[in-house]
């Protein structure tokens, strides 16, 4: 054995080689031929198409939140829920009929109301969350009532309900029978779809307002005595302002605010005690007391003016701006007068210069005329001499 690392190991065959080669297998023994299995009628052979299976389960996924346990609790389990009624919903890619949509909305509203009921039982919720859940529950219940009172045949027509149900013909016939019963009893009063739609919208709005009014009556009370007592306590006749006033007062009663108020009161008490000690130590000064009395009399005499004082101040501020404008106007007017005087002086000087220029021009013109006459006389003499 050439490799020394196996020299001292137990159970090693030192007289045999390290590499072992298997002999070649005959090709006749490795044929791909499969013998046909015997056909047995007791065995059911399923013909599964892979393409159809992929198309059917495309977009589906498994979730780990499904609960199939047998635990008992107030909250519904997340396993498959077997309903008492069988509703046929539209498949993937198919157009949903009005009947199927109505059933689907009812199922979704029932599930939502069950979830809200389960959240009500949760003690860890805050008051705001519970109030919001109550509001949502009221709105959903109102919408459910409106959906239950929906006259499907009257709104969309009996032909659409009967012909568009698809596989749910039995349910469509059942719904048509119920509508016929309502029609016989006089439940249907109008045949105009627009009128019925408006009535449904108005009934939903009225139901929502009634629910909100019921919540206000539960919180405040429907008796006039309680409302008048609330208005007298808060000093306002508006319910929103009264609630804001009460919430502001309730905010002051929080532990953090109480500590701050107590600290400020203690500081104020200490300051008042120190002021009282200083006044007791210094004693009473007659002159000081006399001045305080005079100031009190002055303040008392000016009490009627206090109410008019803001208007007087506003008027004085307005007059101040007016006085500023008047001062600026007077300054501008004085500058204008100065400029006008300088212009008048310049005009007078220009008149004097103009008079002198006119006199000089007249004298020069007279001299020119004399010279022209002399020149003409000489010209005539010269012409006579030439002749």
Swiss-Prot record:
Q: What is its main location?
A: cytoplasm
Q: How does it sit in the membrane?
A: Peripheral membrane protein
Where it sits in the cell: the answer is:
Cytoplasm, Cytoskeleton; Membrane
Q: Which UniProt keywords apply?
A: Coiled coil, Cytoplasm, Cytoskeleton, Dynein, Membrane, Microtubule
Mind naming one GO cellular-component term on file for this protein?
dynein complex
Q: Which Pfam families match?
A: Dynamitin (PF04912)
Q: Which InterPro entries match?
A: Dynamitin (IPR028133)
Say which family it is in.
Answer: Belongs to the dynactin subunit 2 family.
Record's subunit section: Subunit of dynactin, a multiprotein complex associated with dynein.
Protein's job:
Modulates cytoplasmic dynein binding to an organelle, and plays a role in prometaphase chromosome alignment and spindle organization during mitosis.
What is the name of the protein in this document?
A: Dynactin subunit 2
Q: Source species, please? A: Anopheles gambiae (African malaria mosquito)
**Gene name of this polypeptide:** DCTN2-p50
